[in-house]
């Protein structure tokens, strides 16, 4: 049963990749530039890729429509808004059933402190990224939020000392 869950996920990813058009060099440059500064106007973006604004606008809209650009968002400084602690938390579920996996994925969607969640292979089932104000607030979060999720079997917290790199983008070959 566990194998069929992974098989379905992999097949879904392959289908997603097949349903997109290929990127040319200009599309790639647009994506790279927008990952660094999505606040650019179409005119500024066009100047950087050496095209007129109209075709750049059309390309950008196509990249959005086809899902290459998922969304635009502001990157907020966690420390300035009072979240001084970043924790990477490995989670192991009690059992590997489709119902428990789905239950966990559904529950984390409603927890604001969890900013990222990855279904992983290896010793743990999920890796979550959690922001907290301080150690005491993380302890309360762990006990009162994560501790109440029935499908969690165990967890392992890793406290980030310093962020040495975070481009918040993906490589565009």
Residue ranges and their predicted role:
Residues 1-173:
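A compositional/biophysical signature of low hydrophobicity enriched in polar/charged and small residues
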